[in-house]
């Protein structure tokens, strides 16, 4: 596997800043496309090549709002997801398109998003486990080869969900940062299997994660998890909750954004020791701007 195009300088800068600052990450891409661009029947990854100017515009809005870290529009851009969504271009093309779209916004730092693959597996020597690991390796290499500063395996609901994905990402990483982000319940434990967050942190770090965090959970869940993660982690902690489930209307899903609540919460997360804060589904650049103002960015 050729790693000569990996962005080593960007990786070093990401590691340095995660260790010394509280960075502000962008908000979501998928829910913005869904709510503002009437994209209910269009997979987000499709936009990377078909409507790159739209993806870049959303990234630019986040940068203008104060985001220091952008996240590629590749949450569902593995070969498995592209086949499911009937997207013809290759994994390399779609992921490079997403990286190029994000780079058009001139971010300070750029993470490559990798979401759940959706294949069940039962044993580490099974064909299914090897398939997931290979799919993750392929997407990780595509993102790194396109120039991201690090990988972000996000919306992880269980250790079982994480195992082959982290292994595959590490196969491709060759020393590049791999960040892991879990979904937790309101007690701060993993949503999918109920494992306590301390054990999840231990597993992720033991198997090579360079950062641990939570995303796509409620504010209450994030508030419960962050102090526990900071206390148990030896790597930087990240936090990016959502605003809850949308209300279904005739015009599609509507989220009730609460920028003030996120602005207040991000101060608490910084005080608790979080290295990167942001927001997930249902928020927009309005929330990012409120957080940037609260953090004096």
Say what each PLM segment does.
Residues 1-297:
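Domain-level signal for soluble alpha/beta catalytic cores
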């Amino acid at each position: 596997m050729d790693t000569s195009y990996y962005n080593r300088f960007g990786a070093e800068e990401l590691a340095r800043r995660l260790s010394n600052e509280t960075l502000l990450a962008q908000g979501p891409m998928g829910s913005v496309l869904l709510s503002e661009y009437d994209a209910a029947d269009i997979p987000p990854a499709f936009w990377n090549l078909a409507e790159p100017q739209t993806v870049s515009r959303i990234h630019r809005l986040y940068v203008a709002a104060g985001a220091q870290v952008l996240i590629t529009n590749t949450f569902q851009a593995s070969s498995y997801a592209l086949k499911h969504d009937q997207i013809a271009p290759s994994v390399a093309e779609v992921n490079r398109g997403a990286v190029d779209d994000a780079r058009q916004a001139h971010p300070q730092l750029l993470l490559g998003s990798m979401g759940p693959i959706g294949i069940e597996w039962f044993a580490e020597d099974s064909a299914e486990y090897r398939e997931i690991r290979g799919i993750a390796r392929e997407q990780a290499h595509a993102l790194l080869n396109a120039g991201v500063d690090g990988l972000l395996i996000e919306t992880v609901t269980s250790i079982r969900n994480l195992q082959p994905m982290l292994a595959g990402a590490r196969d491709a990483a060759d020393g590049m940062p791999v960040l892991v982000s879990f979904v937790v319940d309101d007690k701060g434990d993993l949503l999918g299997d109920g494992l306590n967050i301390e054990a999840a942190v231990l597993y992720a770090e033991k198997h090579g994660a360079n950062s641990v965090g939570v995303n796509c959970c409620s504010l209450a869940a994030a508030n419960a998890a962050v102090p526990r993660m900071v206390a148990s982690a030896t790597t930087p902690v990240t936090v990016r909750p959502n605003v809850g489930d949308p209300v279904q209307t005739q015009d599609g899903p509507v989220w009730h954004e609460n920028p003030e609540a996120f602005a207040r919460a991000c101060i608490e997360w910084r005080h608790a020791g979080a290295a990167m804060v942001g927001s997930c589904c249902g928020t927009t650049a309005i929330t990012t701007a409120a957080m940037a103002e609260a953090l004096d960015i």
